[in-house]
């Protein structure tokens, strides 16, 4: 533990178009090599594609997708008496959102498709419909936590 005080977390500013902090955080996850304007162009393009295909508000689709992707439980390795146990722990709200956004971007990149705009739009729409790689990752994470329920008393 550091002796000095902890560093204050930087506040994320809402994006100019949708006035949403979630959109800014998603753009930051998409960003590679500090190219934020490129990341924002990809994200806004994907949200436009979602609007065209679903005829719904893209923010509602994104919120639904994020809700279906955010994990409630995860496992953490805990060493007890020479053995490593996978201990299920609850995920804090901030980390839930971060993991959800990270998984959406990760599985968007792994999709087959022409452009990142189409891949991201497809993954968000799939997640909103409870399908896709990011939702599968959440379910796998929950299964791991469920399988290791016996070690829950090792929580710290």
Swiss-Prot record:
InterPro entries: Ribosomal_uS7 (IPR000235), Ribosomal_uS7_bac/org-type (IPR005717), Ribosomal_uS7_CS (IPR020606), Ribosomal_uS7_dom (IPR023798), Ribosomal_uS7_dom_sf (IPR036823). Coiled coil: none annotated. It comes from the Bacteria. It holds the Pfam family Ribosomal_S7. One of the primary rRNA binding proteins, it binds directly to 16S rRNA where it nucleates assembly of the head domain of the 30S subunit. Is located at the subunit interface close to the decoding center, probably blocks exit of the E-site tRNA. Signal peptide: none annotated. One of its GO terms (cellular component) is small ribosomal subunit. One of its GO terms (biological process) is translation. Part of the 30S ribosomal subunit. Contacts proteins S9 and S11. This is Small ribosomal subunit protein uS7. CDD domains: uS7_Bacteria (cd14869). One of its GO terms (molecular function) is tRNA binding. Belongs to the universal ribosomal protein uS7 family. The keyword GTP-binding does not apply. Keywords: Ribonucleoprotein, Ribosomal protein, RNA-binding, rRNA-binding, tRNA-binding.
